[in-house]
C-alpha cells in the first residue's frame, strides 16, 4: 500500500472510530482497540496518523465542535453522525496537523463524505471546512489564492 493510500486508510479507520464513539459512547481506548482488531489491513495503515486523528479528535470533541459550529447554521445534534464525525476529524487535522496542506485535508474529508455520507453530505462538509480553513490557516489559504490568481492572469 502506498504511503498516500496508507494515510487515506488511516483516515477511514479514524472516521470509523469517531463514528463508533458517537454512537456507542464507549471509551476512546475501547474504540481504538476495536477498530485496530477489526481492520484486517491495519498493519498497512499509517498508524501514527490514525492514532493522532482518533485520539486527538476524541480528546477534544467540545473544542473542535466550537471551531466548526459557527459555520453549520443548525444545532450540532441535527447533524448526521457521519457528517459530525467527518467534521470533527477534518477540524482536528486542519488545526493540529499543519504539515498536511489544507486542500488535502478538505479533499480527504470530501472523499470520506462521498463514500460514507448522505447524497449531498460532501458539499456540506466542503463548505464548512473551506470556511474553517480560511480562519484556521488564513496565511496558507491566502497564499494559495494569490498563487491561483497570479496563474489565472498569465493565460
Swiss-Prot record:
<dbReference type="InterPro" id="IPR035926">
    <property type="entry name" value="NusB-like_sf"/>
</dbReference>
<keyword id="KW-0805">Transcription regulation</keyword>
<dbReference type="GO" id="GO:0031564">
    <property type="term" value="P:transcription antitermination"/>
</dbReference>
<dbReference type="InterPro" id="IPR006027">
    <property type="entry name" value="NusB_RsmB_TIM44"/>
</dbReference>
<comment type="function">
    <text>Involved in transcription antitermination. Required for transcription of ribosomal RNA (rRNA) genes. Binds specifically to the boxA antiterminator sequence of the ribosomal RNA (rrn) operons.</text>
</comment>
<keyword id="KW-0889">Transcription antitermination</keyword>
<keyword id="KW-0694">RNA-binding</keyword>
<dbReference type="Pfam" id="PF01029">
    <property type="entry name" value="NusB"/>
</dbReference>
<dbReference type="InterPro" id="IPR011605">
    <property type="entry name" value="NusB_fam"/>
</dbReference>
<comment type="similarity">
    <text>Belongs to the NusB family.</text>
</comment>
<dbReference type="GO" id="GO:0006353">
    <property type="term" value="P:DNA-templated transcription termination"/>
</dbReference>
<dbReference type="GO" id="GO:0003723">
    <property type="term" value="F:RNA binding"/>
</dbReference>
<protein>
    <recommendedName>
        <fullName>Transcription antitermination protein NusB</fullName>
    </recommendedName>
</protein>
<dbReference type="GO" id="GO:0005829">
    <property type="term" value="C:cytosol"/>
</dbReference>
<keyword id="KW-0804">Transcription</keyword>
